[in-house]
Amino acid sequence: MRGQVFTLQGQTYFTFGGASSHDIQDGILDPAAYAFGTQDPDFKVKRKYLDSMNAMYRIKGVSWWERELPNEQEMAEGLENLKKCGNKVDYIISHSPCTSDMFLMGGRGLYQPDIISNYLEEVRATTEYKKWYFGHMHLNKQVSMQDICLYEQILLVPGKDYIYQFPEMEDR
């Protein structure tokens, strides 16, 4: 479902998920053994050791997934969907930032440009938008007038003439 354009409350949104794991320098644990689908008998020992070393690792299927990055088809579909709406949306929502925002934020030595940030840079260069929200950097920071990194912050995105009304309760 990466690269889709949605209209919600009269506003258009381009969405594109995915990111490179930046905190896997010490490896990826696989709780399942490769042979016969049994559990890895040393999984708990390995995890305890990595935790004791304050290691940066992930667990396959729990905190890391093989498809964390988009494939060529998903990226092409995203660009095609933007083209269908004249390369103009109200909001962009992604997990990763585009490369230029990554540089503006400094990256803290953990984040490096990659296939997805470069793709999103292409989206930025070819798309007109009001605001872009992303969260991969785990910060609450306004990077530019249009681009905002969200982590623990929640924002209300105003819709056109949107007033939420609760359904009336029936007296019983």
Report each predicted region and the residues it spans.
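Conserved beta-sheet core of the metallophosphoesterase superfamily
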Residues: 97-171
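Active-site-proximal loop/helix segment associated with metal-binding centers of metalloenzymes
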Residues: 9-110
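Short acidic (Asp/Glu) patches
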Residues: 1-4, 75
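Short acidic-hydrophobic surface loop/beta-edge motif
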Residues: 3-9, 142-144
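A short C-terminal boundary segment appended to hydrolase-like catalytic domains
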Residues: 74, 171-172
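Conserved hydrophobic/aromatic beta-strand scaffold that supports enzyme active sites
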Residues: 3-5, 15, 161-163
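Short His-Asn-centered micro-motif
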Residues: 2, 16, 94-95, 134-136
